[in-house]
Amino acid sequence: MLRSHAAGSLRPADAGQNVTLAGWVARRRDHGGVIFIDLRDASGVSQVVFREGAVLEAAHRLRAEFCVAVEGVVEVRPEGNENPEIPTGGIEVNATSLTVLGESAPLPFQLDDEAGEEARLKYRYLDLRREGPGKALRLRSKVNAAAREVLARHDFVEIETPTMTRSTPEGARDFLVPARLQPGSFYALPQSPQLFKQLLMVAGMERYYQIARCYRDEDFRADRQPEFTQLDMEMSFVDADDVIAVSEEILKALWALIGHDLPTPLPRITYAEAMHRFGTDKPDLRFGLELVECKEFFADTTFRVFQAPYVGAVVMPGGASQPRRTLDGWQEWAKQRGAKGLAYVLVGDDGTLGGPVAKNLTDAERDGLAAHVGANPGDCIFFAAGPPKSSRALLGAARIEIAKRLDMIDPDAWAFTWVVDWPLFEMAEDATAAGDVAVGSGAWTAVHHAFTAPQPQSEATFDTDPAGALADAYDIVCNGNEIGGGSIRIHRRDVQERVFAMMGIEHDEAQEKFGFLLDAFTFGAPPHGGIAFGWDRITALLARMDSIREVIAFPKSGGGADPLTGAPAPITPQQRRESGIDAKPKKDGE
C-alpha cells in the first residue's frame, strides 16, 4: 500500500504516529514561509504542513488536484487553530517527505465552486472528486448492499438476464443493435427484464431479483435517462400483499441508511381516489390542499365554461392578495401545460367574491361557493373545467405549484403511499397524448404493461368492459415521485391472448413476438407477481439530490448525449458494412 492511513481517519489520539497519506491537493496556502495543504482522499481531508528544508521546497510546486503521497508525523494543532467543522480538525500532519504521484493540468472549473452541468458532465471524473457527488455514489453502493441483504434473508436468487434480446412492444421504443452475422437483423436492448423474469418463475426459481440495467429510446423529458437502473423482483405463489410486504421491508432498510425510521405498513390509496383528491397518480402527501369536485355544485349553472364533463377547484390560502400581474402569470403557467387558462375567484376579506369568473355566477352559486370548496376570506379559488383527466391533471399541477410558492412543503418530511386498484386499460389515444407509446393497434392499451393480471372480479369481463376493468397492480409513491411499480402477472395463455387481442395484437402477431412466453405458460406456469423499483430515483431521494444524474456515475445530458465521450457518434463506413446495418430485408421467395 502506498499509504498507512486514510486522510479522514486521523484524530488527536493518533498524535506522535508516523503516517503515510495519499490523495489529492484540495487547497494550498502559503503562510509566512510555511505551506499548508488540505489532502483529500475518499475518506475525508487532513491538513498537512510543510515547515522547512527540502520538503518545503518541494511543496512550492504543488497545485490544486496534484495527486501526492506524504509522509509525516501526526501532531495536535496549536490551540486556537482547530477546525471543528471537519472530523480531522484537531490534528495536522507535519510532513517529512513528499512524492508527486501525478500532476494536474489547470482545472476547467474550481472543485469548490458551482459549475455548469455541461462542464461537470464533460469532466465527470473531476466532478466526482467533490464531496457531494462522490458521497452520492458511495451511498448508492450502500443502497445496493442493503437491498441485497434483505432479499438474501428471504431466499431470493440474484440472476442476470440478457441485455441483448429481440425487440418486443413494451411501451417505449427499443434501442437496436445490428447482428453482424445476420445482416438486416437486430437485437434490442431490454426496456426491462419483464419477460425473462416471468420465464424464471415458470422455470421454478420462485424468488428472483436483479439490479438491472434498462434502456428506453424515449423523446426528451426532463430528468430522464436513456439507460437507467431498476431493482427488479419477482415471486411465485404470492398475492399483491406478499409483494408489498417484502417491498416495504426493503424500503425500511434503505431509509434507515439516512437515519429515518420508516413506519410500516405504508398507507394505501386507490387510483380513483388519488385522481379525485390530488389530480395525479403520484400524490405528494406532505401537505394538504386537496382538489374539490364541483360538477354537482354547478349542475344548474348558466356559466358555459362550467357546463363541462368535469369541474373542480383547488384553494390557494391567502391567494386573493396576489397582484393582477401574478394572476395573469398563472394563465401563462396553465397555457404552458396545454390548457387555455386557469379560471379563478378571489374571496374578499368580507367574504364577497371577485375576479372575472364571479360575475358569471348566480347569486346562489356566489353565496355557497366558498363553503363548498373550503375557502376562507383572503383565499383564491382556482378552477379547471373540461375532460376529467386533463382538468384534474391541471389542478394537480396547480396544487403542487401553490405549495411551492407558499412554502408549504417540509423538505425533511417523507410521505409514502401505495396506489392500488389501477385501471387495466386506457384509451390508446390518451396514452399517446400523454407521450407514451400505445402498444398494439387497438383502441385500448395497457396502463402498466400487457402482462399485468386483471383483478379476479374483472378477469371474465375485461374484454367486454375494458373501461371498468381493474388491474392487480400497485405503485409506490414517495413525496410525489413514483419510485416503484408492480403487479400480479398473467400466468395463463388464454388470459394473455385475450389481453393481447384487446390491445389489437392478434393471434399471429402475438405468436411471432411473444410466442416463447405464451408457449411457456402451457407448461404449468405458477401464479406470480413482482415489482421494479426506480433505483436512480430512490438513490437521488436518499441523497437529497434534485436530479437522478447526480447519483449516476457517468450520466447522459438531458438530450441523451454524453459530453464526456461524445456519444452518440457516427460510425465509420467500414463499421457500417461489417454491421450489416444497411442490409435490405429479403423479399418472400428470395
UniProtKB/Swiss-Prot annotation:
PROSITE patterns: AA_TRNA_LIGASE_II (PS50862). It is found in: Cytoplasm. GO terms for cellular component: cytoplasm. One of its GO terms (biological process) is aspartyl-tRNA aminoacylation. L-aspartate binds at E170, R216, H448, R489. Residues 194-197 are annotated as: Aspartate. Signal peptide: none annotated. GO terms for molecular function: aspartate-tRNA ligase activity; aspartate-tRNA(Asn) ligase activity; ATP binding; nucleic acid binding. InterPro entries: Aa-tRNA-synt_II (IPR004364), aa-tRNA-synth_II (IPR006195), aa-tRNA-synth_II/BPL/LPL (IPR045864), Asp-tRNA-ligase_1 (IPR004524), Asp-tRNA-ligase_1_N (IPR047089), Asp/Asn-tRNA-synth_IIb (IPR002312), AspRS_core (IPR047090), GAD-like_sf (IPR004115). Pfam families: GAD, tRNA-synt_2, tRNA_anti-codon. Residues 557-590 are annotated as: Disordered. The record marks H31, G80 as: Important for tRNA non-discrimination. It catalyses: tRNA(Asx) + L-aspartate + ATP = L-aspartyl-tRNA(Asx) + AMP + diphosphate. Disulfide bonds: none annotated. Gene3D superfamilies: Bira Bifunctional Protein, Domain 2, GAD-like domain, Nucleic acid-binding proteins. Homodimer. PANTHER family: ASPARTATE--TRNA LIGASE, MITOCHONDRIAL, ASPARTYL/LYSYL-TRNA SYNTHETASE. Belongs to the class-II aminoacyl-tRNA synthetase family. Type 1 subfamily. This is Aspartate--tRNA(Asp/Asn) ligase. It comes from Mycobacterium sp. (strain KMS). The gene is aspS.
